[in-house]
Amino acid sequence: DCPVGLRQGCILSPVLFLFFINEIAASVDENGIHGIQLLPGLVELFILLFADDIVLLSDTARGLQNQLNLLNDVCKNLFLNINKDKTKVMVFRKGGFLARNEKWTLNGVDLEVVNEYTYLGFVFTTRMSLKRGVDALAVKGRRACVDCIRHISKLSDISCFFKIFDTQVQPVLLYSSEMW
């Protein structure tokens, strides 16, 4: 039993979480935290937010640690807990190993460095190869297609099959297609 907070499923929960997420994003922005340059001098990306997922982006080890420290401080001030077991670090590089001093912590706890990470259903790898992610999506698409074909014999009209395909299979096949 949790003595504070809202019950799971409470209609206020998403609204309050939006306030918290906006506070976190504003704090990162206001504190001069740097991210990665998408367009030099024009676009800098330092945080990705979706639902209750937060991705911090930095082009240096120190920059990422600064972001983690700030996130931890803001969450403490908002009485939010970060699940350290779900918090991972991924370093994108062409090759080689991490230096011994390339470690990241959150509130004194070492964070796991991973070689691949699934974000919003797409698998990213440290070498930024899209192959692993595309292969995983192809498997999902194949499964959806097989499920659709399995039910075709039960349909009296082929147009129903195409409608089912367009709504159940095509979205799976096209998911993240902008990336590949």
Which positions does each model-derived feature cover?
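Conserved pre-motif C helix in the palm subdomain of viral-like polymerases
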Residues: P3-H34
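Catalytic palm subdomain of template-directed nucleic-acid polymerases
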Residues: G5-L6, I47-N77, F92-G96, T126-K131
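Short, isolated positions in well-ordered beta-strands
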Residues: L12, L45, L111-E112, T118, ...
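Hydrophobic (often cysteine-bearing) scaffold residues that line and stabilize catalytic clefts
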Residues: L12-F20, I47, L64-Q67, L137, ...
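Amphipathic alpha-helical interaction motifs in eukaryotic regulatory proteins
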Residues: F17, I21-D29, N72, K76, ...
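Active-site nucleotide-donor binding segment shared across nucleotidyl transfer reactions
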Residues: G32-L49
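Non-catalytic, peripheral interaction segments enriched in hydrophobic/basic residues
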Residues: A51-D52, N83-K88, F92-K94, T118-W180
